[in-house]
Amino acid sequence: MIASVAGGCVAAAIALAYGASWSVAALCASDLAALVFIAWVWLSVGRADAAATARIARIEDASRVAAESVLLGAGAASLVVVAFTLSQAGAATAPDRGLLTALAVGSVALAWTSVHTVHVLRYARLYYSQPEGGVDFGSQAPDYSDFAYLALTIGMTFQVSDTDLTAKRVRRVALHHALLSYLFGAVILAITVNSVAGLLGQ
């Protein structure tokens, strides 16, 4: 988590040193922080089996929970900066227009991925908190790929499929997750429309 923040600060400083606007610097910072976080998480838990998943998820770390909350807030806040960057792109000429649009698209993709990665960790932690359970994964003990399946299903469809949520604490987090995912979906649609309109206007 500390590496994510440090990387983001370095990216912002470099961008500002090269004369980038505050919005571009902010997106560069959030992009690098998200990239470091995503890589760190999946290198740490990507190959964990069910037993390792349970062991990792049961580790209570208040700083980790706080860092995840900061990442979620930063991901949502970056959407505002993306909107501003797209307005800059609309007024810019080539090749700046294409670069700003590409930065906005990449920023949304990284923020979207980091939000769902945070929820993978949260669902695992909730599942293994007392009383254990809250999600029906069938007869086999879940690993992180199962929690990724749950998080991505909610993130892309705003609902669960064949993994019933049986605990109120999990349903509450799933509701917040679905609402945040809907916000990202709306922004992705807006970026698509903006990009197509820009191409047609050239």
Where are these regions (language model features)?
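The first (N-terminal) embedded transmembrane alpha-helix
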Residues: 1-17, 76
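Pore domain of cation channels
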Residues: 146-153, 163-201
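Juxtamembrane helix-capping/reentrant segments at transmembrane boundaries
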Residues: 53-73
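Alpha-helical transmembrane segments
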Residues: 19-37, 99-115
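Alpha-helical transmembrane segments and their membrane-interface junctions
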Residues: 75-96, 154-168
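Membrane-helix interface/capping segments
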Residues: 42-60, 83-93
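Membrane-proximal soluble regions of multi-pass membrane proteins
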Residues: 125-167
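Membrane-water interface of transmembrane alpha-helices
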Residues: 37-50, 117-128
